């Protein structure tokens, strides 16, 4: 069934089964970095957020102590179709071994704030070292 969006009361934990099809170890280019992006609504700045992936704590602290992006701070005028999330928390993945192809266990808990928090989306981003411009424009061998 549909896992997101999901409401999360203060002090409770949201657990998601997160399937992933991409295997960075099988990619043509080496992995430069990977991060996890989590979308929230009604996340109070004083809330303590804990993010766990496959049993490993990746982030624990105030949203402002991480890479936190508030959508309304970047958008000059309201979009005709706004994002479901009001803000995003980006968490760097230390290496590709943390997340594996197949099912992954994602957990997030929030303590603090007077209203329930809504987790709107979850995304893994891979950044590969590719020199496609250099490959495309290379000088032929003589």
Regions of interest found by a model, annotated:
Residues 1-7, 135-142:
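Activation corresponds to long, low-complexity, non-globular regions
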Residues 39-138:
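Beta-strand-rich ligand-recognition modules
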Residues 19, 35-41:
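Short edge beta-strand/loop segments characteristic of extracellular beta-sandwich folds
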Residues 24-36:
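Extended extracellular/luminal ectodomain segments enriched in beta-structured repeat modules
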